Design a protein with these regions (language model features):
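Short, flexible loop segments at boundaries between secondary-structure elements
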Residues: 133-143
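Glycine-rich, Arg-bearing micro-motifs that act as flexible, cationic patches
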Residues: 110-132
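Short secondary-structure boundary segments
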Residues: 43-45, 111-113, 143
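Short, solvent-exposed amphipathic alpha-helices that sit
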Residues: 21, 60-71, 95-97
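Small/aliphatic-rich secondary-structure junction motif
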Residues: 1-55, 74-78, 83
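Structural beta-alpha unit
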Residues: 77-108
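Solvent-exposed polar/charged
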Residues: 24-27, 101, 132
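Short glycine-rich, flexible loops that bind phosphorylated cofactors or substrates
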Residues: 14, 92, 116-118
Length: 143
């Protein structure tokens, strides 16, 4: 069972559904064990190489915090408490994988949107990186 779930969020409608699904999965753990599972929602702010890694990019951090407040309110509607965190990194994919390793999660649940690049469906760079390097199962929720 997935008692520790990491949900990276980017601000799409799929994030809302991914958080709801994560809450449902984490609540199922309570049936088997005495307490709910744990969910971490993270938003990764990509820092350009020209800037120091700990650079304060107020507008980007504010957007990430607003996004995390939004997903936290969705979790509250589902009667579930989640932890949120803003991560700053050069690359989004490695930051997600590192966070999964650090927290010892059992599942990464990512909401994705249907994107076309050059007329074909594209997952971008982040999702394939996470799928290839994740230490745990990954569920993609397509909106």
């Amino acid at each position: 069972m997935f008692s520790k779930i990491l949900v990276p969020v980017v601000g799409s409608q799929a994030d809302d559904e991914a958080i709801k699904l994560a809450c449902t999965l984490a609540k199922r753990v309570k049936d088997k064990e005495k307490e709910n599972g744990k969910i971490w929602a993270v938003s990764v702010v990509a820092i350009k190489r020209a800037l120091p890694l700990d650079a304060e990019i107020d507008s980007e951090i504010k957007k990430a915090e607003d996004l995390l407040n939004h997903v936290q309110s969705i979790a509250e509607e589902e009667e579930f408490e989640i932890e949120t965190d803003v991560l700053q990194a050069r690359e989004v994919g490695p930051a997600i994988v590192d966070e999964a390793v650090e927290r010892g999660v059992h599942l990464i649940l990512m909401g994705i949107t249907y994107k076309k690049q050059f007329g074909q469906f594209s997952l971008g760079n982040v999702v394939p990186y996470v799928l290839k390097n994740s230490p745990c199962p990954v569920i993609l929720y397509q909106q």
